Design a protein with these regions (language model features):
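Transmembrane-helix signature of polytopic, membrane-embedded enzymes
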Residues: 159-183, 404
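Membrane-interface alpha helices of multi-pass inner-membrane proteins
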Residues: 221-252, 266-269, 463-464
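Lumenal/periplasmic acceptor-binding loop at the mouth of the active site in multi-pass
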Residues: 93-142, 310-394, 403-406
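Specific aromatic-rich, kink-prone transmembrane helix
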Residues: 199-216, 437, 441
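Transmembrane-helix motifs of polytopic, lipid-linked glycan transferases
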Residues: 4, 146-167, 389-392
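Short acidic/glycine- and proline-prone juxtamembrane loop motifs at membrane-interface regions
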Residues: 192-196
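Transmembrane signal-anchor helices characteristic of membrane glycosylation enzymes that use polyprenol
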Residues: 44-92, 101-105, 268-284, 464-471
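Perimembrane helix-loop-helix junctions
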Residues: 37-41, 241-271, 286-298
Length: 481
């Protein structure tokens, strides 16, 4: 039967319950001795159709984006790839720095926040260098598209697997929630834009699956497993490393702070990332910056129009950038002045889920206003439905240790964006770091609510998934075609 959930023995073997101490961190999951974790990247039989459909959908989205690119994106040789990509790529607030790295191995992304992103892209850069010599065309866009499709497809597989194995949903519910999650505008864009978010999303979903499986089996996360998860997750996006620490704490408790575990799981990866940062900064970034300053010194006297354009851009950014706590590193990205409630309505739960028709896919650093209102009042109604479904999911998952872990990770994102204001003006592009929590909690509502209420929530979720796919995909495809 297609809707039959995975075999389970009893509620106490799978589902969390309060221990006798009745404390927050003593929520327990009883072990399921029959399950082991082997070759987690092997696609299982029931996941094959999902993987195939996902791959085709994500490949199509990437093809649409590549089709929209100008001919200059495919030129090879000793060219100014910064000017080619940075000045002509505008998709919301996403960056095209990976295209530049794949073309000439120059680093323009913030190295301190993405210390191993260059290492992830390096094989692609080597491949592109060989292909450019062979084809005389820059294949960076195609290489990045392949990487994104693979990452997005496995993200869909792990999302589905978490729904099936850890939340214990039937296949139909897992399909509905997977379609619902990837119908979100920000997630759909994440699977096709040349930024780090799609890779970060995969790292986080793999981490949730591995740690959740350990908890379900009554096992502890091994130090080398935590080390690998922390290295990959924090290496792609440093702040996400905190979530690996949160997950390790939920799984292993205070043993996380034992000298041996802490050294292997966190200190060793930090040393590796620190060494990688130092090498790239000293031998790639600094020489690159010095060369750029030299070119600027020679060019500026001859091109006063460049200084004028830079002044206009700086004035725009000053007018639309919130006031930071300090100009010190990391603190310079904070924001204490942008209204929080409007950010939640229009950007966090707004643009993150449904694109605004006005100023479609424009970049805040170029021309997009901080806040845009929807053309249709019904868009706010659908946003309210998503929020209510999320709230219901939080209620029904309140006894789940797995969901408390995921919600704690999402709370860290809320602290970063809503309290500190990190990236608040473009908070919608960070949705891949946390928004999977919404459908995960909804899965518990499907499972635990009374049948009539559960069926009503399924129906609303299915309708929203179909609507968001039609609405967001139509806007994206027509925009790029």
């Amino acid at each position: 039967m297609p809707n039959k959930p995975p075999q389970k023995s009893s509620r106490n073997e799978i589902f969390p319950h309060f221990s006798s101490h009745n404390q927050f961190f003593t929520l327990t999951l009883q072990p399921n001795k029959n399950k082991t974790m082997k070759n987690i990247f092997k696609i299982k039989k029931e996941e094959r159709i999902l993987a195939l459909v996902s791959m085709l959908v994500f490949a199509s989205l990437n093809a649409v984006l590549i089709h929209s690119y100008p001919a200059s994106f495919f030129k090879a040789g000793k060219l100014g790839f910064w000017s080619i990509f940075y000045k002509h790529f505008t998709v919301s607030g996403f960056d095209a720095y990976s295209y530049i790295f794949l073309s000439n191995e120059k680093i323009y992304f913030e190295l301190s926040r993405h210390p191993l992103f260059g290492a992830l892209l390096y094989p692609g850069a080597c491949l592109n260098d060989w292909l450019m010599g062979w084809t005389h065309h820059n294949c960076a866009t195609f290489i990045m598209a392949v990487m994104l499709v693979i990452s997005a497809t496995f993200s869909a597989v792990f999302f589905f697997r978490i729904c099936r194995e850890l939340i214990q949903l039937c296949r139909l519910d897992a399909y509905i929630l997977t379609a619902f999650f990837f119908s979100f505008a920000s997630i759909m864009l994440t699977t096709m834009v040349p930024d780090h978010f799609c890779f970060s999303m995969l790292c986080l979903l793999v981490s949730i699956y591995m740690v959740g499986t350990c908890m379900a089996q009554g096992k502890q996360l091994k130090a080398w497993q935590a080390s690998l998860l922390f290295l990959t997750t924090a290496g792609v996006s440093l702040s996400n490393g905190v979530k690996t620490g949160i997950m390790s704490l939920f799984c292993n408790g205070r043993k996380v702070f034992s000298p041996r575990f802490f050294a292997i799981a966190f200190i060793l990866p930090l040393l590796i990332m620190g060494g990688s940062f130092y090498y790239q900064n000293e031998y790639i970034v600094k020489p690159q910056q010095e060369k750029g300053k030299e070119i600027e010194r020679k060019l500026m006297p001859k091109r006063p129009d460049i200084a004028q354009k830079n002044a206009v851009h700086d004035a725009w950014m000053d007018a639309h950038r919130g006031k930071s706590v300090s100009d010190m590193p990391f603190l310079k990205w904070t924001d204490v002045s942008t209204p929080r409630m409007e950010s939640i309505v229009e950007n966090l739960f707004g643009e993150g889920i449904q694109l605004h028709q006005k100023e479609l896919l424009k970049d805040l650093s170029v021309s997009r206003p901080t806040f845009i209102r929807y053309d249709w009042a019904i868009s706010y109604l659908f946003e309210a439905f998503v929020f209510l479904l999320f709230a219901a999911g939080v209620f029904y998952s309140r006894h789940s240790r797995l969901m408390w872990m995921c919600l704690s990770c999402a709370a860290f994102d809320a602290f970063l964006h809503l309290v500190l204001g990190f990236g608040l003006n473009e908070v919608y592009i960070m949705a891949a770091h946390w928004m999977f929590v919404i459908p995960f909690t909804m899965g518990y509502a499907f499972r635990e609510a009374q049948p009539k209420l559960a069926n009503a929530m399924r129906g609303v979720t299915l309708f929203l998934a179909i609507y968001f796919w039609a609405y967001n995909a139509t806007l994206i495809i027509t925009h790029f075609l």
